[in-house]
Amino acid sequence: MKNYLIAALWALCILNIEAQTDSTTRHRPWLAVGEAAGINAGVWAMNRYVAHAPFAYIDFKTIRKNFRTGFVWDNDKFSTNMFLHPYHGGLYFNAFRTNGMSFGWSAAGALGGSLMWELFMETEPPSINDVLATTAGGIALGEITFRISSSLVNNHARGLERVWREAAITLISPVNGFNRLLRGDMWRVNTLRDAWSNEESHQTCATLSTGTAWLSPNGKLFKGTINGFLKLKLEHGDLFSKPYSAPYDYFEVQADLTIRQQATMGDVSLLGRLWSHDRESTPGKKLIWGLFQHFDYIVKDTTSNNRRQVPVQISGAAVAGAGLIWINAPQSDPVKLKTSLFVNAVLLGGTHSDYFSVLERDYNLGNGYSIKSFNAITLGKYCRIKLNYHLMHLFTWRNKIDSLYYRTLDPHYLDVQGTQSNTLVHVIQGGCDVALSDRLSASLDLYYYRRESRYDDFPMVTTNTLRMTLGINWWLSNPRKLSPASML
């Protein structure tokens, strides 16, 4: 199973090997390899000489042992495996992307960087789930941060504008900022315009939302916690009027911070077009079908009676599949409709487990499928009603924890996906946006999360969680009123 999963990642890289490159940047493959290796060396050095982490004390014996042991399912905490590893993969990806390499070669670079870390850079056995999450999640986060940061490039800018642009580029994609510094592009003023900053073909619509969020971990209407939230939504490219040209020429991003005593990441959802074809029957009516990549990281925490609960814990770190989108938006018609359906394979997903707790892991890993549907109707220019549904069916196969031998084994070598089970996760979202001006709108959203975990050796567990948000949205750039194409 593990070999098949890694082979699937290699196939994804090879299929996209000739995908679009950055034509304005000279190809520097060896520099890209060196930077990816340097990222690993830097992280290892921090752990070895600053943090003195036990796993960083490597030598030739530990490397040989890793090759002999092979890949296992590790027991790191949810945020590490399902978000930080994909972010790390995005750094590998951009080491190649920002050195002029294609999407496919950059995907291969993310896989290579992950394999280098797992096999050579730590004493713990190599992790198959880390390779999957780092590569697939790194492709999504890497290409998105590359395109967003590159769209901010303006080689004409001077003074304060140039400073904030270069700072934003580096914040969004540290590797892109590093390479611009290395090449001297960060301060060089010229008349050349970067290929990725073409506003005509790479428009970005960004909205920032803030407000109040109510969360009930037990599904009870009048019991729960109230916190603030800060949400960023990005729609990059034009799905409605621009045909497919390259992977991720269209993508959407939604990132949600929960504001309590401190801000905590609670929701990251990504949708990127890998390939598509479309047919427009009449002006304003278009049917689009193709392949799409998804990334989901959803954690909703609450504290009640001095006890921490985890009502929602969902991850789709390696997800891709087919999608069908129908848009009915004639320019003269005040009522515009969008509906979509995505059927995906889940190479790696994760959900909360009620019976598994080893080291830092309290969740199940697994494979399965997911179905997503996004639906919205826009009434005039000032009101949009939406109804979205997300189903994930995750199967946890590998579990040897009941064996006496595995109970006495070093837990780092346990090699289990979790408690053997199959889990259905349902996420239903309904909401309404009302525009207040060209750049301001108010929104009310309701969420229902349901988890049905059927365990082979334990009683079934069902959880229900309700969430409601009331907020104000501010269009940061390119206000499009209420875009009928936006799906997240």
Predicted regions mapped to residue ranges:
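Extracellular loop and loop/strand-boundary signature of outer-membrane beta-barrel proteins
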Residues: N218, N305-V312, Y355-D362, H412-T419, ...
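Detector for outer-membrane/organellar transmembrane beta-barrel domains
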Residues: D296, V310-P411
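Outer-membrane beta-barrel "beta-signal"
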Residues: L182, N464-L488
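Repeated loop/turn-to-beta-strand initiation elements of outer-membrane beta-barrel proteins
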Residues: G104, I148, F240-Y244, T282-K286, ...
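Residues on the lipid-exposed face of transmembrane beta-strands in outer-membrane beta-barrel proteins
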Residues: E143-I144, T212, G228-D238, V268-E280, ...
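Hydrophobic alpha-helical membrane-anchor/signal-helix detector
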Residues: R26-A53, S79-F120, L132-S149
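Transmembrane beta-barrel strands of outer-membrane/channel proteins
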Residues: S173, A206-T212, D249-L257, W289-Y297, ...
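Residues that define the transmembrane beta-barrel architecture of outer-membrane proteins
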Residues: G137, H202-T204, F222-L232, T264-L270, ...
